[in-house]
Amino acid sequence: MDLKLSVLIPAHNEEGSIRETVHGVFDILVREKILHEILVVNDHSTDRTEEILNKVSEEVLSLRQIKNSLPNGFGYAVRCGLNNFNGDCVALFMADASDSPDDLVKFYRTLIKGNYDAVFGSRFMPGGRTIEYPKVKLRLNRITNSLIRLLFGLQYDDVTNAFKMYRAETIGGLKPFLANHFNLTVELPLKVIVRGYSYTWLPNQWSNRKTGATKLKLKEMGSRYIFIIFYCLMEKHLTRGDYLKKKVL
């Protein structure tokens, strides 16, 4: 059975890329005849993002835009979207056009065919690709992911990658969310893993933004990533399975 896909796009001051991002997603999903909605969460933008979205909504009938009802911030915007999407599964997609719309199709079909609860992206496995990844950010990424792999005993090598797809029931089983910032992209997959949901990972492509400024502040995120990583580690070892996925009898 086909599932309705929600593509969740948090957007803060993305006037330079939001049109390209929405149209890119829409064109691919229509071509592949995938039932979908494109849910853009306007994260308190002060530029022309809202104006552009209003115009794009006349061209892209599957576009639904909402305003972030929570405080400003990437994690808050994603949480707002996760509380409001209406699909059977949801994929997090960056507004800066750094993700590839083609990967949505591959992940969607794998989720259905394998009956997985989640599908994760890896930019560093064979078939994955990064374009113009900043060297300092790349080095920190590899160190962080190596630490996570060691602590959790994982083969998966790109937990910090935001590009992932989840079934709606899986998202429900990951609540309540703790992270309010970019560390939410680590909280979600680690909870999938420690709570016993089924998952696989596929290669995906990432390219550095061409317009606008990155919203990720590395100096501010270190302690937040550490908090989430060790929270999930404690949940794994100390909660005696209280949060594990309920088995269907």
Task: List the model feature ranges, each with a label.
Residues 1-27:
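N-proximal low-complexity "stem/linker" segments adjacent to membrane-targeting elements
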Residues 4, 113, 227-249:
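Terminal low-complexity segments of carbohydrate-biosynthetic enzymes
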Residues 4-6, 37, 187:
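Cell-envelope/extracellular polymer assembly enzymes that use nucleotide-activated donors
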Residues 42-51, 97:
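A conserved acidic beta->alpha catalytic loop
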Residues 66-84, 89-92, 98-182, 208-219, ...:
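Acceptor/aglycone-binding surface of glycosyltransferases and processive sugar-polymer synthases
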Residues 182-188:
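Acidic donor-binding loop at a coil-to-helix junction in glycosyltransferase catalytic cores
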